[in-house]
Structure formats: structure tokens, C-alpha cells
Amino acid sequence: MPRIIRSQIVLSLAVSLASAVCVAQSPGQATYQARCQMCHGATGTPSAGMAKMMSIKPVSDPAIKALTADQMFTAGKDGKGKMKPVTGLTDAQIKDAVAFYRGLN
């Protein structure tokens, strides 16, 4: 194989790998996806069935936008309404998940 073609292949592989590594998650994204997304939705909008069953509003709802990060943290940590308290997460993980969720709108 000519040297130029081999160099182009190596370069394209290196660029592909580098771009895959650069797509990093925010600190709370993995936690949100694992622990919150099933109810609150991937984009912060719950499915119609989940919204009705659990009385969940989308992150874009004015009532949700009006909540502070501390209020959301407390709701996650202690539970609120039909949402049970989050267990097995540190305060930092809950705060990171809240920050990620608030950024979805």
C-alpha cells in the first residue's frame, strides 16, 4: 500500500477516535440518564402517559422553571408528590443531575 494512502488511513482513524473521545458528558448527564430520564424524559419532557400517571411537568413548564436548583435538589433528595426520594446517590450527584436537567430547556 502506498505510503500516502496508509498515512491518510491512519490520520482518518486518529481523527475518528479523537472526536469520539471529545464527546464528553456533563457531570450530571450520566446520573440523569440512569436515574431520572425514565420518568422525566430524555429531553426533560415526560411521555404523555408518565406525565399523567405521575403528574410530571416538562422542564419547560413555567412552574418548573420557577423552581430554584436548591428546591429541585430537595425534591430529588427527599421526594415530592408522587416522586420518591432518590437513594444511592451522593448530594453532589443529585446536584449535578439537577444542573443537567435545568439545562435541558
Residue spans for each PLM region:
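Electrostatic cytochrome c docking/interface patches
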Residues: 15-31, 47-48
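Mature, folded catalytic cores of secreted/periplasmic enzymes
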Residues: 14, 39, 61-65, 95-98, ...
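C-terminal capping alpha-helices of c-type cytochrome domains
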Residues: 75-76, 87-105
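Bacterial N-terminal signal peptides that target proteins for export
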Residues: 1-12
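Periplasmic/extracellular electron-transfer cofactor-ligation site
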Residues: 29-55, 78-84, 103-105
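Electron-transfer interface patches adjacent to heme c in soluble/periplasmic c-type cytochromes
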Residues: 57-70, 85-93
